[in-house]
Amino acid sequence: MDEMEVFKYQGKRFLCSGEQLPSGSFQAVVRCKLPPDDLVRTLILGAGHYMNGRQALARAKELAEEWVRTHPEDEHL
């Protein structure tokens, strides 16, 4: 089963999830709303495969934190 959570980090909001793949493993995914249209966009599709949605969700949160550190100029999230 997929796991999903709105994750706030340093004033930014992400939709983090652990999504089940056809193989049965799970992938970490990070999305957010981006201007100008506020459509939800995928920022990161994690490369790893996890045994369950909870593990993939935890990794998605880590990836969101890394994204904030590597994109300090993106204040509009």
Language-model features: where?
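N-terminal segment of the canonical double-stranded RNA-binding domain
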Residues: 1-29, 33-35
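Acidic, low-complexity intrinsically disordered segments
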Residues: 40-77
